[in-house]
A protein has these predicted regions:
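Helical transmembrane-bundle signal
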Residues: 12-19, 62-69, 90-97, 115-121
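Membrane-helix boundary connector in multi-pass membrane proteins
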Residues: 76-77, 84, 91-108, 118-123
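Cytosolic, membrane-interface loops and tails of multi-pass inner-membrane proteins
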Residues: 25-50
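Polytopic alpha-helical membrane-helix bundles and their juxtamembrane interface segments
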Residues: 3, 17, 29-33, 72, ...
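N-terminal signal-anchor transmembrane alpha helix
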Residues: 3-25
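Hydrophobic core segments of alpha-helical transmembrane domains in multi-pass membrane proteins
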Residues: 9, 86, 108-115
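Helix-coil boundary and interhelical linker segments in multi-pass alpha-helical membrane proteins
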Residues: 1-9, 70-81, 121-123
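Alpha-helical transmembrane segments and their cytosolic membrane-interface
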Residues: 41-85
Length: 123
């Protein structure tokens, strides 16, 4: 079973990388060329930045799942360790809207709060 969990972890990370790279190259770029994107806050920049972080946040989540699967395969997945992985996954998820939308999409506040609470629970 250990090897299958390692394989699942590898597949989760690989899928995340493929999702971000291929999605950026073949979906997002083409989508952003459209003339009919919603104009929020005076233009389409907020819309494109929000769509970009929303796309890539899936990859961060899959990396977090990959870490959980890896630790499950190693047999050292504890409640505290699980909370640490969840906490760091949410902190990394919060960095996406903070950086990509320059803080305009306020989800980063909630994502950081969730991550902080999870890390606090792990301590």
């Amino acid at each position: 079973m250990k090897e299958l969990l390692y394989l699942a972890a590898f597949l989760a990370v690989t899928l995340g990388i493929a999702h971000s790279v291929l999605g950026e190259r073949y979906i997002l770029v083409r989508l952003f060329r459209r003339d009919d994107l919603p104009k929020l806050f005076g233009g389409t920049e907020f819309t494109t930045r929000t769509l970009r972080f929303a796309w890539h946040i899936t990859t961060v989540a899959w990396f977090g799942f990959g870490a959980l699967l890896l630790h499950a395969g190693r047999g050292d997945l504890t409640p505290s360790g699980t909370l640490r992985i969840i906490g760091f996954t949410f902190i990394l998820s919060g960095l996406l809207p903070l950086v990509i939308t320059r803080g305009k999409h306020l989800s980063w506040l909630v994502l950081f709060a969730i991550g902080g609470i999870a890390l606090w629970g792990a301590a």
